[in-house]
């Protein structure tokens, strides 16, 4: 009887794990079926158009705009990977490290590179697997532990022990984890449109609306098919994400120009360029929830109210995981791509946060 009591907790844990993974893969199958129907519909309308992809051999001129900074590379010790980044501002100034989301790369921070270089060494990174940064082949190389170690090693390689850390979307997830695991490395934390990781995992299990909005997390668990679907019709999905009325950048004057959009398509149309970014998501269900989750770094959370991928209620709940100073600002009529959609307002809010004194909660 005593042995049975000892085994019962392990048995319950095993059953919960089996149930969880059964639900994950069932939803993966459902998402894959929906995308397969989309593919068949596209083929029915015109197979030639579905598989059309013009060659893009040369990067658009905007990617070499000198006003954005200097293209640099650093090889880090732990993994041996070479990382690409664009840096603006003088060496020796305090470091501001910018982590992009999906499907983005360093260029999504173009407004911030210009804005903050007067007082900071601003570094906009291509994350592991993105852009000109090395992309390991195996999905195991994209676990959250690896991504966290990347940022720690990059700081060391750049000669800094701490930074102002800003992350958007998936980069926001990594920024939260850095602040949790290495609080001494983060002077101030700024996250754009991504809640605390524990809030995200708890909320998605209880709210079907967020489960639907995050369906791509599940679709990305499937090998090769997501990359294929992302690239058909000359990257129609990518264009839709940034330009459509439902998901795109809506503010007039900040919408992506033809050249901006071509820059995104150029980067993700390179051979194998989609597998690295999607591999980030292929490990997420084995890494969450977190064992340690409290944030002690002064934190600013910025949120676009019209985010098509994240429920705004998650932003409000995030404050329970921040022990120290926490400020939340929700911008009305702003999309998920907040730092590109409302750059003037976002930059002003960041400046205010950086310059104000942040005291611990009583």
Curated annotation (Swiss-Prot):
The active site is at residues 169, 281, 336. Residues 94-211 form the AB hydrolase-1 domain. GO terms for molecular function: epoxide hydrolase activity; hydrolase activity. InterPro entries: AB_hydrolase_1 (IPR000073), AB_hydrolase_fold (IPR029058), Epox_hydrolase-like (IPR000639). GO terms for cellular component: membrane. The chain crosses the membrane at residues 17-37. Keywords: Hydrolase, Membrane, Signal-anchor, Transmembrane, Transmembrane helix. It is a single-pass type II membrane protein. It is found in: Membrane. The keyword Cell inner membrane does not apply. Its EC number is 3.3.-.-. Belongs to the AB hydrolase superfamily. Epoxide hydrolase family. This is Epoxide hydrolase 4. The gene is EPHX4.
